[in-house]
């Protein structure tokens, strides 16, 4: 008695497709495996994982690329599989499904060529309160950020989320670009400054110091407040670490900040 290739809802075909084993996929289909089983699982996950030849074959065999709200093109975009994305679009995939998920997640993950392609095909890069530029900034993808801004993205959306999150994760070049485009690092009660201090990004703190005189006072005061908080909680190791950062900045910017020390 032969093996049941359709066992557990065509699980064999699902795994072969997901992992890109085109010869196995073709064999299973020749033995009557169902390419549309489980909401077209096979083509969805072959697309997500960038297995172009598998995707094409499954589509030729009748797989529905638009199942589960265009899962295939959304996750191919999120994972950077440009060839698969273009093929799916040619076959009628909706790149704007689920509130322009495709361009948003391609931006978040820094896949600039996919972002450019999706925008050229009509994707709304400003969907969900400029999600794309906000999270491309958070993840430090400067090229994507620049492209989106050139296309008209609002870098100040959601109370300057872009520059605030870039400050958390230490993306100095993104911060410089955002500020050149009008981002306000003083928004939300100096959130960018506070977070750059909290997450120990001295190069960003130093950059903020160069921007205007009154910022110096704010940075010194915020630094002292943070040091006081650490001292009150007996966090000696952290206190020493932050004191070292603080002293480095004081020494480097002696002329502009030393006179501000209480």
Swiss-Prot record:
Keywords: ANK repeat, Repeat. ANK repeats lie at residues 8-37, 38-67, 68-97, 99-127, 128-157, 159-187, 189-217. Gene3D superfamilies: Ankyrin repeat-containing domain. Disulfide bonds: none annotated. InterPro entries: Ankyrin_rpt, Ankyrin_rpt-contain_sf. Coiled coil: none annotated. Pfam families: Ank, Ank_2. This is Putative ankyrin repeat protein R848. It comes from the Viruses.
């Amino acid at each position: 008695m032969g093996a049941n290739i359709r066992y557990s809802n065509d699980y064999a075909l699902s795994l072969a497709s997901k992992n890109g084993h085109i010869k196995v996929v073709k064999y299973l289909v020749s033995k009557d495996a169902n390419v549309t089983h489980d909401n077209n699982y096979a083509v969805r996950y072959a697309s997500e994982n960038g297995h172009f030849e598998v995707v094409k074959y499954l589509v030729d065999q009748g797989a529905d690329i638009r199942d589960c709200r265009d899962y295939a093109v959304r996750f191919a975009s999120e994972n950077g599989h440009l060839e698969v994305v273009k093929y799916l679009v040619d076959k009628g995939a909706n790149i704007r499904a689920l509130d322009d998920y495709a361009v948003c997640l391609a931006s978040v993950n820094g896949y600039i060529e996919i972002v450019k392609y999706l925008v050229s095909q009509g994707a709304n890069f400003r969907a969900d309160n400029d999600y794309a530029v906000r999270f491309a900034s958070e993840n430090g993808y400067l090229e994507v950020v620049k492209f989106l801004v050139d296309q008209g993205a609002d870098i100040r959306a959601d109370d300057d989320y872009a520059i605030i999150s870039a400050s958390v994760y230490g993306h100095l070049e993104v911060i410089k670009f955002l500020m050149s485009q009008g981002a306000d690092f003083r928004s939300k009660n100096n959130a960018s400054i506070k977070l750059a201090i909290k997450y120990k990004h001295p190069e960003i703190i130093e950059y903020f110091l160069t921007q205007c005189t009154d910022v110096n006072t704010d940075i010194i005061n915020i630094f002292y407040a943070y040091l006081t908080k650490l001292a009150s909680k007996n966090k000696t190791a952290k206190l020493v670490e932050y004191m070292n950062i603080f002293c480095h900045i004081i020494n480097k910017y002696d002329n502009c900040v030393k006179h501000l020390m209480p």
